[in-house]
Amino acid sequence: MALAVLSQPRFRAGQLVMTAGVNDLVQRGALDPVPYLRRHLDGDWGNLDDCDRRSNDAALKSGDRLFSSYQVTPTLKLWIITEWDRSVTTLLLPSEY
């Protein structure tokens, strides 16, 4: 029997919010945001360059904003942003920024 190990998130998500574009994709079954949100909360920043990854790692300590980018499909990118005070995490499409 395999045991699933659930890790504690590296930071609080606060209130979870998704934009209209993300909500539409979720409602149509074109996007399951949960795996990407888990990755974000675990400190897996997705498709960022080294500089942005280091900025996020530093922001975990300093309390600055956290940003992740995930290439869901060749034509679909999902951004996740957690505010500096960890009060809100927003899931959005780049076109909605």
Each PLM stretch: what is its role?
Residues A2-F67:
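Compact soluble domain cores
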Residues K61-Y97:
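Short, compact, well-ordered microdomains
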